[in-house]
Amino acid sequence: MKPSFMNPSFQKIIQILNGGGVIIFPTETLYGLGCDATNPQALLKIYAIKNREFGKAFPILVKDFKMLSEYAILSAEQKKAISAAKKPTNFVLKAKNISPLATKNHTAAFRISSGSWVKKLFHFFDKPIVATSANLSGQKPLSDSRQYREVFGSKAELIDAAIFTGVNRKRSGSRIVDLTSRPYKVIRK
């Protein structure tokens, strides 16, 4: 196990993210496997860790509408749809300034996170964060970040830190709504 692997300080987490590292962290839905969404090397690590099909886009967390507008092309109508969401929802939008490894056809699924831990992270980290479920592609999501070695096996060595908040995350994933289609299309409920 790496030094300060479990529950490192926010300062250490920022160093990891800025250095192209990967973390397991709590979101408002599931535990996420995350990295700096603008860093291609970090994204390649997540593809490897998850055994994910190359070219499949990742969900991306942003701090607020200001950050969202830096990384997505956003109309007033789309902003209104995002503001009206009653539960955690990823919205597919045209992406900009994001690594092409995080997008598909120049689109990505963005979410303004309501998770308390993620909100704290955004006080220190001012870039979008990939937040794909912490699991191998096609498998059940991790419900306890301390079980990462069981889930990821030898690929666990590619993970730089895990944050455990004491809450087992057995919720379902977030909704996905495509705002690039007319009418808007619900991809996952």
PLM regions and their residue ranges:
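Active-site-adjacent structural elements in enzyme catalytic cores
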Residues: 1-189
